């Protein structure tokens, strides 16, 4: 009996790698008519630094989630033409080899303008060392929006793919589509992310009723959600209702944010006819429940990226930021080590929820909420002015970045004395699926 229970426990609490969750929302489902594309990025490591980088070595410049200025792969990005791409890894397309999903995205950001350009790329890409098992999400400045399931066929050495148009009411009647890690064309009931898919479906359905969809709403309600649809349990709601009576620790089981989470990113596209350089990214690097959403644009180049999300120029020894790591990411991960503080045995399968959210209002999510609100409100007000002008003013962007930097660096929760439980935060994380 003990063996059976132990086996069940391992199955319940096992943490899967590459457990990404995503959505594409067309303009018909948002209040302002602009599309949104979101990905909660997970990988194989528990604690690794991520950053936003700028790349101008291809046909088109782009900014996004990649590890350096000359990356071979990208994991989420937007280019100067308003082409935006992300992916979630497929775990029921069986390839048997290391995946090259990010290589395709980097190539797409370099050369694509439209969704059709990306489809054409899949037809023509050279494949000597590329292996793909992925769901690519794409939006463009012309209103294109689709998921494309892609797998590599070793028998033909070509890519096989299926396009799911989010503008098609037969496929997405409410104007949005969700993907996790199982493919509609993969092996049935295999793969992962079914519970996260159901949780996201419930949350988005509730938001759709009043067209609540904004970048901030998505990060708050999805990337900081502790709702498990299979169990019918929402830990944040339980705390708010005074119903949570636990000791603080809960299983880190099938939530959208998890110990393997690297970042949460939303990109807001443009309406037809708008300047594609107004395409706006928002990223909560590290672990979204302990991070702050920071905006980014392609228009300002590398200097236009906020200092807290790009590679760190100055080693902030007072805050123990790793050399060339993104400041906000390492600050977030320092708090994350306090959430996942039990490292012996199966301890990493549990998180200290009371550190994140509690009845006293002192959880990390609660302390960072006013910081993020100030950043978000300030940015959206400036963005509206740029939309009226039809372009981003680089001097105003620099001033905005300075204000955001000051707000984030002044957050008291980031200035407490924390001890790393897992050693120094590293720079790994190339497999952000």
Labelled PLM ranges:
Residues 32-34, 81-83, 114-116, 132-133:
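Loop/turn elements at helix/coil->beta-strand transitions in domains of secreted/extracellular proteins
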Residues 13-19:
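Sec/Tat signal peptide C-region and signal peptidase I cleavage site
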Residues 21-22, 27-71, 77, 83, ...:
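C-terminal, well-structured catalytic/ligand-binding subdomain of enzymes
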Residues 4-13:
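Sec-dependent N-terminal signal peptides
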Residues 92-136:
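Proteins synthesized as precursors that undergo proteolytic processing into mature forms
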């Amino acid at each position: 009996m003990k063996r059976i229970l132990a086996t069940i426990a391992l199955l319940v609490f096992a943490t899967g790698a590459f457990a990404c969750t995503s959505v594409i929302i067309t303009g018909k489902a948002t209040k302002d008519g602009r599309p949104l594309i979101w990905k909660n990025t997970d990988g194989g490591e528990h604690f690794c630094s991520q950053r936003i980088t700028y790349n101008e070595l291809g046909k088109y410049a782009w900014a996004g989630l990649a590890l350096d200025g000359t990356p071979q792969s990208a994991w989420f990005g937007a280019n100067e033409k308003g082409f935006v791409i992300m992916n979630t890894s497929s775990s029921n397309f069986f390839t048997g080899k290391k995946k090259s999903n990010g290589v395709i995205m980097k190539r797409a950001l370099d050369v694509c303008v439209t969704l059709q350009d990306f489809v054409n790329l899949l037809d023509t890409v050279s494949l000597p060392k590329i292996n793909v098992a992925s769901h690519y999400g794409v939006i463009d400045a012309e209103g294109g929006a689709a998921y494309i399931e892609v797998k590599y066929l070793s028998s033909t050495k070509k890519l096989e793919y299926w396009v799911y148009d989010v503008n098609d009411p037969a496929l997405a009647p409410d104007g949005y589509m969700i993907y996790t890690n199982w493919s509609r064309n993969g092996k049935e009931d295999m793969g992962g992310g079914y519970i996260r898919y159901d949780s996201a479906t419930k949350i988005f359905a509730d938001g759709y009723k009043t067209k609540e969809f904004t970048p901030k709403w998505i990060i708050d309600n999805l990337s900081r959600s502790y709702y498990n649809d299979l169990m019918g349990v929402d830990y944040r709601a339980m705390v708010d209702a005074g119903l949570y009576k636990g000791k603080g620790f809960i299983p880190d089981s099938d939530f959208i944010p998890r110990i393997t989470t690297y970042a949460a990113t939303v990109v807001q596209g443009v309406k037809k006819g708008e300047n594609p350089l107004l395409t706006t990214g928002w990223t909560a690097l590290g672990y979204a429940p302990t991070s702050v959403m920071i905006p980014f644009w392609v228009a300002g180049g590398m200097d236009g990226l906020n200092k807290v999300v790009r590679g760190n120029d100055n080693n902030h020894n007072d805050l123990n930021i790793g050399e060339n790591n993104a400041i906000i990411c390492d600050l977030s991960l320092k708090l994350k080590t306090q959430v996942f503080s039990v490292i012996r045995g199966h301890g990493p399968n549990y998180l200290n929820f009371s550190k994140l959210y509690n009845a006293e209002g002192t959880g990390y999510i609660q302390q960072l909420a006013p910081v993020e609100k100030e950043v978000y409100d300030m940015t959206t007000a400036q963005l509206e002015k740029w939309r009226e002008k039809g372009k981003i003013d680089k001097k105003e962007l620099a001033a905005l970045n300075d204000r955001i930097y000051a707000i984030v660096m002044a957050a008291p929760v980031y200035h407490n004395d924390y001890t790393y439980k897992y050693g120094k935060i590293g720079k790994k994380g190339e497999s952000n699926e």
